[in-house]
A protein has these predicted regions:
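Conserved SAM/SAH cofactor-binding pocket of Class I
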Residues: 2-71, 199-283
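SAM-dependent Rossmann-like transferase core, predominantly class I methyltransferases
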Residues: 4, 147-215
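Short beta->alpha hinge that forms the Motif I/post-I loop of the SAM-binding pocket
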Residues: 50, 121, 243-248, 293, ...
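Short SAM/SAH-binding signature in class I
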Residues: 85-91, 278-286
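N-terminal auxiliary segments of SAM/dcSAM-dependent transferases
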Residues: 98-178
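Conserved helix-to-beta-strand junction in the class I
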Residues: 105-110, 304-311
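Mobile active-site "lid"/loop adjacent to the S-adenosyl-L-methionine
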Residues: 246-247, 283-306
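C-terminal catalytic and target-recognition region of SAM-dependent MTase-like enzymes
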Residues: 308, 315-353
Length: 353
C-alpha cells in the first residue's frame, strides 16, 4: 500500500517523530508504521483508532504473534492508558469539534514536553488548527506544507494537563418528535446527524414497514435515531445496531439508554461482523468517508445483505436520489420498489423471496 500524503509529510519531518512511546491517533494502515520503525526505534507504539476498518488493518498486520513489533492497538471512543506518551500524532478529523474532544481525551497521558503533531489534507480544514486549539495548545505552529497537506506542532498548555476528561460532558442531546413519538438523541463530536434529524432519516422514519417485529438490523446506525424510533414504535422488535465508528456506537448506546431501550450495538466493516439473520434491515447508508465520497461499503452491504435476511425478510433504505442503489438491490435481493421521493431523497424497499 502506498503512503498517503499526510504520511509522506510526516516522514519528511522525521526529526519531529523521535519518541520512546508515541501515540498514533486515527492514522490509517498505509505503510507509515513500517516506515517509522525503519528510522526510529521506540519502546512501543500505541495506535488508537475510532474507525473499525483502520483498527482491523493495523491489528492484523502488527499484532499477530508472528509479527509483533511492540505495536498496541485500541478501538474505542475514548483512549485510556497508564503510559505517558512523549509524542502524539493526530490525523486531523473531519469534524472540527472532534479535534478538541481528542485533545481533551489524551490530557491524562501526556506531559508538558509531549509533542502534539496535527496532520491532514488542506481540504479537511486543517488550516484552522492553530485557532481551533488556542485554548488547549500553546505554540501551535505550521511547520510544513507539502502534497496538499499541512503539518502543525504544538505543546499542551500546562494548566490543561490537569483537566479531568468526562465523556458525558461531550454528548450533545437533542429532542425530536416523529409521528407523535418523542425521542432524545445523544451524539458525540463527529457523529452523523449531530444536533438535528437529517432530511433523509426523517423521510425513512415516515415510510417504514407496517407492524415491524422480530430481529432488526440498523446498518450505519450513527447516533441511533432509527433504532430508537423503531424500538419505541414497535415493541415486539429486537434491535441490533452496527457502525464503523466507535464514536457513533457509543452515541447510539447512550441514545438507547436515554429512551429506555436496549440493543446489540457492535462494530462491523460493512457486513464483516454480522453473524445473525434479520426480519427487517433499515438504513440510511453512509457514503462519505471523512470528507471524501465513498460508495464501496454501502454497495457491498446491499450486495451481501440477502445472506443475512430471513425468508420473506425485507430491507428499507433511504439514499440520495442520484445514487444508483436500486439496480444493486434488484440484482442481489429481488424486486425493489420506490416507496417515496422527496427533497432529493428516495426510499427503497426490497423483500427476499
Amino acid at each position: 500500500m502506498s503512503l498517503s500524503n499526510p504520511s509522506q509529510i510526516l516522514l519528511r519531518n522525521s526529526e519531529l517523530l523521535i519518541a520512546k512511546a508515541p501515540l498514533f491517533i486515527n492514522l490509517p494502515e498505509d505503510g507509515f508504521i513500517d516506515a517509522y520503525l525503519e528510522i526510529h526505534k521506540p519502546d512501543s507504539i500505541n495506535c488508537f483508532n475510532t474507525n473499525f476498518i483502520d483498527y482491523q488493518a493495523i491489528t492484523k498486520k502488527y499484532c499477530s504473534s508472528s509479527n509483533n513489533k511492540s505495536v498496541q492497538t485500541t478501538f474505542a471512543s475514548t483512549y485510556q492508558t497508564k503510559t505517558c506518551h512523549d509524542l502524539a500524532i493526530i490525523a486531523f478529523p473531519k469534524s472540527k469539534a472532534e479535534l478538541n474532544f481528542t485533545l481533551a481525551m489524551i490530557a491524562h497521558c501526556i506531559n508538558e514536553e509531549t509533542k502534539i503533531l496535527l496532520v491532514g489534507e488542506k481540504k479537511c480544514g486543517i488550516q484552522s488548527a492553530a485557532k481551533l486549539t488556542q485554548n488547549i495548545l500553546s505554540c501551535c505552529q505550521k511547520v510544513d506544507a507539502a502534497r496538499h497537506c499541512l503539518l502543525f506542532v504544538g505543546l499542551f498548555q500546562p494548566e490543561r494537563l490537569s483537566d479531568v476528561f468526562n465523556l458525558q460532558d461531550w454528548f450533545k442531546t437533542y429532542h425530536i418528535t416523529v409521528e407523535g413519538i418523542q425521542l432524545t438523541i445523544a451524539s458525540l463530536p463527529g457523529v452523523f446527524s449531530q444536533q438535528k434529524l437529517d432530511v433523509g432519516t426523517a423521510l425513512l422514519l415516515s415510510n417504514l414497514p407496517n407492524n415491524m417485529a422480530g430481529e432488526i438490523l440498523d446498518f450505519g446506525c450513527g447516533a441511533g435515531v432509527i433504532s430508537c424510533f423503531i424500538g419505541k414504535k414497535f415493541s415486539e422488535t429486537n434491535l441490533s445496531l452496527l457502525d464503523v465508528s466507535a464514536l457513533a456506537l457509543t452515541s447510539a448506546q447512550e441514545s438507547l439508554a436515554l429512551n429506555g431501550l436496549s440493543g446489540n450495538v457492535f462494530p462491523s466493516n460493512s457486513l464483516s461482523d454480522v453473524n445473525e439473520h434479520y426480519q427487517h434491515v433499515v438504513s440510511n447508508p453512509p457514503f462519505h468517508q471523512g470528507v471524501k465520497t465513498h460508495y464501496q461499503a454501502s454497495e457491498d452491504f446491499l450486495a451481501g445483505i440477502n445472506k443475512k435476511l430471513n425468508k420473506q425478510g425485507n430491507i428499507t433504505i433511504v439514499a440520495n436520489s442520484f445514487l444508483r442503489y436500486q439496480p444493486i438491490m434488484e440484482a442481489h435481493i429481488g424486486n425493489t420498489r420506490v416507496i417515496t421521493k422527496d427533497k432529493g431523497f428516495t426510499v427503497y424497499r426490497a423483500q427476499l423471496a
